[in-house]
């Protein structure tokens, strides 16, 4: 499911810039995030029921971009509403299972969060015209 094929009320996304816990190597971080943390969320029904989609985007290595200030990965969590996000982090299972696991591999104090609304699509594939704020594109390029 993507934004373009989602029907219904606008979704919210929690985008988190993640940094690994000091002393943990990049590969250890990636392995724990992929093989332990993600499956832990997915296999906990009282958490999984609140979230529409959970994406893990590990940092590309070698990273040619500077200025990312040690970000090791980006987590994107899709929710139907802010209320669903609040319910997700309020679940006892989150406090008992997920929060302690996060401390095993994340630098909790260095995480940066952004909660976003429905996106404005500027480009939707090669050569595709996307509607902007003024309506459908005419195919002209600026």
Labelled PLM ranges:
Residues 6-142:
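Macromolecular interaction modules
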């Amino acid at each position: 499911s993507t934004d373009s094929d989602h029907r219904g009320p606008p979704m919210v996304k929690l985008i988190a810039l993640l940094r690994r816990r000091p002393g943990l190597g990049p590969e250890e971080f990636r392995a724990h995030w992929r093989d332990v943390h993600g499956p832990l969320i997915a296999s906990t029904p009282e958490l999984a029921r609140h979230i529409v989609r959970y994406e893990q985007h590990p940092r590309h290595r070698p990273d040619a971009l500077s200025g990312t200030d040690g970000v090791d990965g980006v987590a994107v969590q899709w929710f139907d509403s802010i209320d669903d996000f609040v319910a997700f982090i309020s679940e006892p299972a989150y406090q008992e299972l997920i929060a302690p696991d996060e401390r095993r591999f994340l630098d909790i104090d260095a995480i940066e969060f952004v909660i976003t609304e429905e996106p404005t699509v500027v480009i939707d594939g090669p050569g595709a015209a996307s509607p902007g704020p003024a309506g459908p594109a005419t195919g002209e390029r600026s």
